Design a protein with these regions (language model features):
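N-terminal amphipathic/hydrophobic targeting modules at extreme N-termini
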Residues: 5-7
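Alpha-helical scaffold domains
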Residues: 26-242
Length: 242
C-alpha cells in the first residue's frame, strides 16, 4: 500500500496511511482507509486528472487523482454497504476530490430521512466546487416533503455558497410540480449573493419554472422582480432546454 500511495498527488490523504499500532482488520477504520486508497491508485488516469483540473479550476489540482465518474459510482455502491462506511463519512475534510465524489454517491444511497439529512448537513460545508455539488442528490428527501421544505428554507439562510445552492436545488427538484407554491419564487428571488454558482442556480430554477409552472414563472419574469443577469440567464437556459 505504501508504494501505491506514493502515486497519489503530493500531500493527499494521510488518512489512507496505516498508523502505528493499527491493524487492518475487517471493520476497523484502517481497513476502509486502505481500500479507498488502493481503489484510487488502481483507477488513476493522469490524462483524465489533467482534464479534470482544467474543468474545475477553483480547487487545488494536487487533490485530483483522476478517477472517472462511472468507476467512482460503482465503487461507492459497495462502499455504502460496508459496516465501516461511517468511518469514511466521518473523515472530513477529505484529502482528494475523488473522496468527495465518493462521499456524495455514498450518502445518496441512504434511505432513512433523518440520517440522510444529518449526512447532508455534515458534508455540505466541505463542498467547494460545482462537480461535487452536482453529484449530491436531494431526491432522497422526497418521501418527507414537509420536513424537506423546512430544511430547504433553513439552508437558504446559510452563509455557505453550496448550501444555499443545494437549497435552491431542493426547491427546483422537489417543489416545482404538484407541491409548488407561488411563495417559493419569493424565496429564491430573495437570495442575494455574489457567488456565480448561487446565481446560476437561481437562473436554472426559473428556467425550470418556465417549463413546469409557465403562467406563474412568466408573470415573475415579466414583473421585473429578477435582477438583470438572472432574468437574462433564466431565459437563455429555458430557450436552450427546448
Amino acid at each position: 500500500m505504501a508504494d501505491g500511495l506514493s502515486l497519489l498527488p503530493l500531500g493527499v490523504s494521510s488518512w489512507f496511511a496505516t498508523r502505528p499500532g493499527e491493524k487492518a482488520e475487517k471493520g476497523e477504520a484502517v481497513a476502509i482507509r486502505e481500500d479507498v486508497g488502493a481503489f484510487l491508485v488502481s483507477h488513476a488516469d493522469e490524462g483524465y486528472r489533467a482534464f479534470q483540473a482544467k474543468l474545475i479550476p477553483n480547487i487545488d489540482a494536487a487533490t485530483i487523482v483522476g478517477v472517472r465518474t462511472p468507476e467512482l459510482r460503482k465503487f461507492a455502491k459497495g462502499l455504502a454497504r460496508r459496516e465501516d462506511a461511517g468511518e469514511f463519512l466521518a473523515a472530513l475534510p477529505h484529502g482528494t476530490f475523488e473522496e468527495n465524489q465518493l462521499h456524495s454517491f455514498v450518502i445518496a444511497q441512504e434511505r432513512d430521512f433523518d440520517k440522510l439529512v444529518g449526512e447532508i448537513e455534515r458534508f455540505l460545508p466541505f463542498v467547494d466546487n460545482w462537480a461535487t455539488f452536482d453529484q449530491l442528490s436531494c431526491r432522497g428527501l422526497a418521501p418527507n416533503p414537509d420536513a424537506a421544505l423546512a430544511k430547504a428554507r433553513a439552508w437558504l439562510e446559510s452563509d455557505h455558497e453550496y448550501t444555499v445552492r443545494f437549497a435552491i436545488g431542493v426547491l427546483m427538484e422537489l417543489f416545482l410540480d404538484e407541491r409548488f407554491r407561488p411563495e417559493f419564487f419569493a424565496w429564491v428571488i430573495g437570495v442575494s449573493r455574489p457567488e456565480y454558482y448561487v446565481n446560476m442556480m437561481r437562473a436554472w430554477y426559473f428556467a425550470e419554472a418556465l417549463a413546469k409552472q409557465p403562467a406563474a414563472a412568466e408573470a415573475v419574469i415579466a414583473s421585473g422582480a429578477l435582477d438583470e443577469w438572472t432574468h437574462n440567464k433564466a431565459i437563455q437556459k429555458a430557450v436552450e432546454s427546448r
